[in-house]
Amino acid sequence: MQSVIAYLKQQEIKPLLRFITCGSVDDGKSTLIGHLLYDSQCLAEDQLADLTVDSQRYGTQGEHIDYALLLDGLAAEREQGITIDVAYRYFDTEKRKFIVADCPGHAQYTRNMATGASSADAAVVLVDARKGLLTQTRRHSYIVALLGIRHVVLAVNKMDLVGYDQQTFEAIASDYLALAAKLGINQVQCIPLSALEGDNLCKRSARMLWYVGPSLLEYLEALEPADVDLAAAMCLPVQWVNRPDSQFRGFTGTLAAGRVRSGDGVVVLPSGCVSRVVRVFNGDTEVHEAVAGQAVTLTLADEIDISRGDVIAATDDPPEVADQVTAYVLWMDDTALLPGRRYWLKLGARMVAASVSDIKHRVDVNTQEQRVAQRLQLNELGYCQLSLDAPVAFVPYARNRVLGSFILIDRQSNATVGAGTLDSGVHCASNVHWQPLDIDHVARARIKGQTPKVLWFTGLSGAGKSAIANIVDKRLHALGYHTFILDGDNVRHGLNRDLSFTVEDRVENIRRVAEVARLMVDAGLVVLVSFISPFRDERQLARERFAADEFVEVFVDVPLAVAEARDVKGLYAKARAGLITDFTGIDSPYEPPQHPELHLRADQGTPEQLASQVLSLLGVEGK
């Protein structure tokens, strides 16, 4: 029993190193990790037995063990002989514990590689000695640099296939050191090895006596990862407001930087309220001091409104607070990122609505060149400006990974669609404030004797939106209502004449119209908006500009065949002939509303009958 306790204590104090392996397809990443696991005797007997069987069934090494099969766990990976998902493995030696991520080499899985790199202390970049640096080598090295991994190993693999030639290794090492210098990677260890044969993997190889450096495992065991900067100003992202009873109110989270003691002055962000730390807890134990990386609970001297997602920070050098930020964004979804489209941005425990207001440039991660872009496709990286609905506290990623990284979440599916690293805040509008007005929208509506709202008519071209809206407008006007129609065609003659019909410009088209409609509702009007508005995200954006009872979505539904048969403007014929591109229903999608306030079947009634349904919904039909 004592030996077990001693072993567990030894495991507790062993330092942990997280590292990734990356590089081009078939450079031997999975083989390298598998051989490390095998040589470090971290495999159970049943795993060894399974490996022998799998090597015969799936292996690529003839009668020999195929170490890569320890990592390639998906059936698709084994059948294709490639890595698709990020495979995490744990192993340890007498000196250290390791968590290693085997990242896929194919370009289409760059998002997976970035996921693995986000928490790594070091990166092992593999290069095939026969091929030298390839496009994916440069791509992965750029992402390694972008994500702030400071320790990089260049593992020139398959040296057995070039006769363990020194000149081949030195030429590749020279090329990579030049690339690393360009990317700002300063700490690079170049190691020649053979993952298959085990040369320079766990111990020095007799086949390469010309190499005087450490083996890969020796280097990783001795590596000192970047220590948490305890000299940095204290930052605590609040994950939980801890109130076990009415006598105790603490704020719990993991310290992202610095150290904290009782008596320290703090500021709460983004509110800016100032207080003082009274007590510090690590778990249930009150402590004098806590440092970065520890989970803590703080109590403060003052009753301050603090919620999950707020940041408690030292007063001398607090994080920046902004609602406009610049960041590198790696797009991870099949549907492109579009400026103006709204997402959830999750930074630590804080969640705010956000949109990309501008893509400054797209980065060609193969060449590091900056290119003009109007959207970001899957696996593309862009330098963007983001607009947030509320200010957030952050630290640039180069200084703090926790408070400098975020993810973007699709508001409809809740899928993670992007990841980013924050660069700086944009304060171009920090001196712009709301001007208080004595006459508000309630007073304007009262004098008109009506309840202002927006009727948002959406549907395919030719569905009858404009005709129905026009009839509703005439009937409301006859009843003494103050109304205005914003029609899609008419607005494009003035306000939106600079916009095309690309997906990007359609997003901006709806954003502008929603803002104009909001101003008109504030003026006390009943606004009828007649736009195709094909995308749910943009209609949701419009809805969020209004109070819950001010927005009425009217879906004018008609089969595409019926709308195309009408074709009053001849647009469908032109789209079919290829004279018009990005035409809704033909080569651009229409996303029907899921829960409209009113669903009109436009092929089952006249415009007058359908208009009556709208008026009935408003409670004015028959007046």
Curated annotation (Swiss-Prot):
GO-annotated biological processes: hydrogen sulfide biosynthetic process; sulfate assimilation
UniProt EC number: 2.7.7.4, 2.7.1.25
GO MF annotations in UniProt: adenylylsulfate kinase activity; ATP binding; GTP binding; GTPase activity; sulfate adenylyltransferase (ATP) activity
InterPro entries to which the protein is assigned, alphabetical: APS_kinase, CysN_GTP-bd, CysN_II, CysN_NoDQ_III, G_TR_CS, GTP-eEF1A_C, P-loop_NTPase, SO4_adenylTrfase_lsu
Residues holding ATP: 459-466
G1: region residues: 23-30
Region (Sulfate adenylyltransferase) residue spans: 1-450
Swiss-Prot/TrEMBL keywords: ATP-binding, GTP-binding, Kinase, Multifunctional enzyme, Nucleotide-binding, Nucleotidyltransferase, Transferase
Binding site for GTP: 23-30, 102-106, 157-160
Active-site residues annotated for this sequence: 533 (phosphoserine intermediate)
Subunit structure of this chain's protein: Heterodimer composed of CysD, the smaller subunit, and CysNC.
Family indicated by similarity: In the C-terminal section; belongs to the APS kinase family. In the N-terminal section; belongs to the TRAFAC class translation factor GTPase superfamily. Classic translation factor GTPase family. CysN/NodQ subfamily.
Known role: With CysD forms the ATP sulfurylase (ATPS) that catalyzes the adenylation of sulfate producing adenosine 5'-phosphosulfate (APS) and diphosphate, the first enzymatic step in sulfur assimilation pathway. APS synthesis involves the formation of a high-energy phosphoric-sulfuric acid anhydride bond driven by GTP hydrolysis by CysN coupled to ATP hydrolysis by CysD.
The protein's name in its UniProt record: Bifunctional enzyme CysN/CysC
Species for this entry: Xylella fastidiosa (strain Temecula1 / ATCC 700964)
